[in-house]
Curated annotation (Swiss-Prot):
Residues 167-207 are annotated as: Linker (Gly-rich). SMART domains: RRM (SM00360). It is found in: Plastid, Chloroplast. Keywords: Chloroplast, mRNA processing, Plastid, Repeat, Ribonucleoprotein, RNA-binding, Transit peptide. It comes from Nicotiana plumbaginifolia. Expressed at high levels in the leaves and seedlings, and lower levels are seen in the stems and roots. GO terms for biological process: chloroplast rRNA processing; mRNA processing. InterPro entries: Euk_RNA-bind_prot, Nucleotide-bd_a/b_plait_sf, RBD_domain_sf, RRM2_NsCP33-like, RRM_dom. Its main location: plastid. GO terms for cellular component: chloroplast thylakoid membrane; ribonucleoprotein complex. This is 31 kDa ribonucleoprotein, chloroplastic. Residues 175-190 have a biased composition (Gly residues). Residues 165-203 are annotated as: Disordered. The keyword Plastid applies.
Length: 292
């Protein structure tokens, strides 16, 4: 077993000539380490002759980036990754497919210290799903990043950035912007609004609706819509929030325009990893109408 000691800290990326070795939904984590305490113990049997370690220059002089690999997971010895409050997490949507975790980290470090970056990938195709999550060090940096990068253009796309936890409730809100000035970015947080949805009191057909459970607290209507749009035309996407606290209850509903899209979504998305959780997708049971 070969051991490599790093004296001057830089970004380190372990790369392989085999693209399939990369783990989809890999998380890029940043954390401080003393310059003398980092040791990478790499098993020659798990890496092979094709692996290499390349320095990556960054303004972070005392931070280390480690990308998660299937075959290196047990061979890289580092400090345990700390947990961060959901208040420090940002959702980043409408990303170009070429943007990976390293590129996203390089952008958001302009607003402060980046702790964790995750771009969400499709397990089968390995392609980016066009959205991800960024965790900053402080709430002030979260606000700065949201103000600085919401609407920021990358490769011709204006990215969407908003904080993970639910903001204060607003009446009659919807993502698409109810006319008359009552719109809010995330939408659906007061139980009377929806992402793409029915405006002016029109009801949404619930016959083609799926239930989505075990959602991370940082997933909102926008993230849900971004994910499920890959399987068809999303008529409505809504995360259910607690009326008192305003926080996500960890589940939501997505409505499609056809039964085929519902079946495709269940087959393709049930059990996939979204922001560190294996989501549950099933046909939603229509609740019986109240009798008065």
């Amino acid at each position: 077993m070969a051991s490599s000691s790093v004296s001057s800290l830089q970004f380190l990326f372990v790369t392989s000539q085999t693209p399939s070795s990369l783990k989809p939904n890999s998380t890029l984590s940043f954390f401080s380490l003393p310059s003398s305490s980092l040791n990478l113990s790499l098993s020659s049997s798990s890496i092979g002759h094709s692996a290499s370690i390349k320095p990556f220059e960054s303004s972070f002089s005392t931070r280390v980036a480690l990308s998660d690999f299937d075959q290196l997971e047990d061979d890289v010895e580092v400090a345990e990754q700390p947990r961060f409050s959901e208040d420090l997490k940002l959702f980043v949507g409408n990303l170009p497919f070429s943007v990976d975790s390293a590129a996203l980290a390089g952008l958001f470090e302009r607003a402060g210290n980046v702790e964790i970056v995750e771009v969400i990938y499709d397990k089968l195709s390995g392609r980016s799903r066009g959205f991800g999550f960024v965790t900053m060090s402080t709430k002030e940096e979260v606000e700065a990043a949201e103000q600085q990068f919401n609407g920021y253009e990358i490769d011709g796309r204006a990215i969407r950035v908003n904080a993970g936890p639910a903001p204060a409730k607003r009446e009659n809100s919807s993502f698409g912007g109810g006319r008359g000035g009552n719109s809010s970015y995330g939408g659906g947080r007061d139980g009377n609004s929806s992402f793409g949805g029915a405006r002016g009191g029109r009801s949404v057909d619930s016959s083609n609706r799926v239930y989505v459970g075990n959602l991370s607290w940082g997933v909102d209507d926008l993230a849900l819509k971004e994910l499920f749009s890959e399987q068809g035309n999303v008529v409505d996407a809504k995360v259910v929030y607690d009326r008192d606290s305003g926080r996500s209850r960890g589940f939501g509903f997505v409505t499609y325009s056809s039964a085929k899209e519902v079946n495709d979504a269940i087959d393709s998305l049930n059990g996939i990893d979204l922001d560190g959780r294996s989501i549950r997708v099933s046909a939603a049971e229509e609740r019986p109408r109240r009798q008065f």
